Amino acid sequence: MPSKVICFWVEPTELVQVTFRRYVTTGPVCNRIVTPYEGAQPTTWGYHDAEVPIEVRAKRPDDAGHDADDDERTDARWPTKCPCGYVFPPDVICRVHVRTLYRSPQRAGQWTLHDVPAGAMWDAPWLKGHDGAHPKPDNLYLVLRTPFFDWTIDGPSSNGNRAGWTRTGRPPLVTVNPSIGYGEPQKMHGWLRNGVLEVDLP
């Protein structure tokens, strides 16, 4: 069914969100249906996973996600079970995530790039030079969150075109050519015109 996703710009703040995450990729399969972010297409989660927010604080120069050390693992705030009810054994993976918070001039709220809604568009300078894409005149590397995946607008396309897409306009009111398709067989197809992602499949 055709739909439209209105794009909005997000930019990093000087704040980070710290979370505790436990997950296990072996053993019984987790078949819960999840919507990983606002506007996302629901999907089946294949493994047991739970994450809880711990704090929001100012950025530090040495911020980085990491496996929890022995002292951190004793914290009582770690999730004890997956939302499906599966109880984590004591030896599962424990990760401390430290993610930058983003905000938008067009929309209220703050998000990390882990949970930013569909329609969010941002500059990803850390991707420049990693895939051979041609730099754009505004020196931005645009990424757009769609209902299915993160579209690297300024990256190469999966069909082998290293130049990727062409775009005009000022973010988030950009027009991109050609269209975007996702999946094999195709799960999504659409056009980005003047800051609106017009999805014609599904």
Task: Name what the model sees in each region.
Residues 1-141, 149-202:
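A short Gly-Trp-Pro
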